[in-house]
């Protein structure tokens, strides 16, 4: 951001010295958009299943869309853009002469002039979080509302989602003509929150029983978490019984489809099954038990693991990226009368997972390391 305010999308090359970081000297500016106000400026950036880059931009901010950008397809504001950063598409339309991308065959594209060819979906207020279902490829948009309604939309090429004529399903700035508009698959009012944080359709295994195939999302203000199921004739929405997590800013998924979320407190949280167990041997869960305390912990963490299973038992600690940071036991059956401990003093603050694996079951427990 600068003065005048603008949003920038840039490409960086990985550092040759450290491939996990970007080389700041390699910046290539792909796109810059002038912003009239200091909110609703952007936020979402991801490659879709088609290999194109998708970027979301709000209506330019302030409140009530004073510049009427939501229903103006000749501006890139209030939209999700689809860009080809590998070349091979049409020339940029509304991105300016210095834009470094081409335009794929978006539905709205009509050549120079008229609607911006870069637009994939529009009529959005603040779609700062959107995602794609890793199984079906379907795009999901969480659009932050104005006075009363937060909404979830299914992304369609060329779709107009109604802002600022509509807020969710409600008429906002009439006259309100619904023709040609796409309305939310779900909405909730401000008695439950005030700023939706979009998530993902869960495709992992750790919480498949509870969340499989459902769109998991939350609210920044209330900290509530929900799972939306649209597989039936009518969508159903369930608040997850995990408490509330205020200032929830973003969700993410790993290579296995496991789901995480973060807050402004700097911690990373991961979704697990309600029972935190999976069993393949048909034996009762009582034969394997795992408890971890204290949490939060600053230094010594105690792990009580009971496993009467035949064969070896392994107990290890993992960070949120799935990297093993400590092995507490790898051998014969364990008794809870002999607790395990590990020193967390050398670990960065954050969420960790203690996992016990036997021939019959896998149990996991979370522990937060605080500083």
Spans of model-derived segments:
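Blade-level signature of beta-propeller repeat domains, shared across WD40, Kelch, NHL, RCC1
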Residues: 249-276
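Asp-box/WD-like beta-propeller blade repeats and closely related beta-sheet repeat scaffolds
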Residues: 5-46
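Recurrent small/Gly-Pro-centered beta-turn motifs in extracellular repeat architectures
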Residues: 1, 57-59, 143-144, 219, ...
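Beta-propeller domain segments
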Residues: 8, 59-238, 257, 271, ...
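Conserved blade-ending motifs and adjacent loop-strand segments that build the rim/top face
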Residues: 235-255
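C-terminal outer-membrane/trafficking sorting elements
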Residues: 283-293, 297-371
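Short glycine-/Asp-/Thr-/Trp-enriched loop segments that recur within the blades
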Residues: 34-43, 120-122, 246, 334-337
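Low-complexity, Pro/Thr/Ser/Gly/Ala-rich linker/spacer regions in secreted
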Residues: 272-288
